[in-house]
Amino acid sequence: MKDRKILNEILSNTINELNLNDKKANIKIKIKPLKRKIASISLTNKTIYINKNILPYLSDEEIRFILAHELLHLKYGKYHINEFEEELLFLFPNKEAILINLINKLHQKK
């Protein structure tokens, strides 16, 4: 399992990259089993949930991608509007490869 300190460092760095510092103090990470998702965010209580069953197999870059994705929901809302996708692609030019790896890991751990 990834050390909570590492997760919080990646979260803090990603918050800075996305210029979400005004929301930084309120964002929490919770690790729990999720049936069909790698991660999700509650926009109401600003909590990112990461799938406990997949977390040990994720690289730091994959965790950064997941956190950025969820934080962009906090920034832009529930839907993947153009600005959401453009900002994610700017941070991760290899976005498609990361997504393929994450989907493969999700299916392997079911």
Swiss-Prot record:
InterPro entries: Peptidase_M56. It comes from Methanocaldococcus jannaschii (strain ATCC 43067 / DSM 2661 / JAL-1 / JCM 10045 / NBRC 100440) (Methanococcus jannaschii). Gene3D superfamilies: Metalloproteases ('zincins'), catalytic domain. It holds the Pfam family Peptidase_M56. To M.jannaschii MJ0123 and A.aeolicus AA15. This is Uncharacterized protein MJ1213. It comes from the Archaea.
